Amino acid sequence: AGVVDVFKEAGLRIFGPSKAAATIEASKDFAKQLMAKYDVPTAAFETFEDYEAALEYVRKGSIPVVLKYDGLAAGKGVVIPETFEEADEALKDMLLDDKFGKGKVVVEEFLTGPEFSFMCFVDGTEVYPMTLSQDHKRAYEGDKGPNTGGMGAYSPVPIITDEDVDYAMEKIMKPVAAAMVAEGCPFTGVLYGGLMKTPSGVKVIEFNCRFGDPETEVVLPRLASDIYDIFSAVADHTPMPEVEWRREVTMGFVMASKGYPGSYEKGFEIKGLDRLPEDIRVFHMGTSVKDGKYHTSGGRVLMVVGFGSDLQEAHDKALAAVESIECDNLFYRRDIGWRVL
């Protein structure tokens, strides 16, 4: 049983999905089969356990292609090979060498278009939308380099229209919530839709059963309502109070250890956090305190969030704060928000 199941058995209130409902994130194959069954728009796909069969399928299709390890892989289980050789290498890793454990691989078509994150509070068939955000997955500026857990984010996302959001609600988030109920594993908690606006409409890239990181750091500061009331309504299955959002917009930069998402060193001192302006929010992702001083202790170390009346102002404030933080082993992307600035 998962932690939510254990709490419920003990008669305790808890916000979050059951272990069964969390399968929507824990298994890519489960999520894809669910979408196929309930006609939720997503990339065409096929699931394989056999290396030869997967390789043959990739050979017949077009490159680039998307390869997803079926289970949880700490955000590293998705590969987008640009050549057939790279695809072969990745399939060997996943299916022959069991790099992430024994499992299956979902092979899906490569979609193009801007991605955005649509998080919703869900209680069975009731779906309450949060404001949109956009993450920046690649390690380096210009969207270059390997995929990471996310190097920055902003909210809202002007390039996504109200029509896009309505479509995502009516054709994706609500139907998926209803599908989970129909499948006997109703979802409660935060359902995160990783969506893409393709030339043929909004489609699902992935689902997570939790708040997204780094998106949450730019979304929740914009929440005007008391989050406790929201959690309570979902946990108790009672009507949700109206969820209100601030007009101020947000943008945040992640400061990561040099070498991330590969191997990196830890233990570098971070200076200047006590000198930042009042209206800058700093989220500690991978820091430790030793003798009253902050040190790096993870891959993604800090996220620095700025506020503004528009995204340019939020960007400039956050970037100025980032540039004033001193540490010998951190890097960051200066181009967070490039699609909208």
Features from the language model and the residues they span:
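Short, charged, surface-exposed secondary-structure boundary motifs
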Residues: T23-D29, Y140-G142
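A short, GP-enriched loop/loop-strand-helix hinge that lies immediately N-terminal to
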Residues: A1-A26, V40-E49
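Conserved anion/nucleotide-ligand pocket segment
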Residues: S62-F84, V219
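Active-site "cap" helix and flanking loop/linker of ATP-utilizing ligase/carboxylase catalytic domains
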Residues: M169-L191, N208-D279, K290
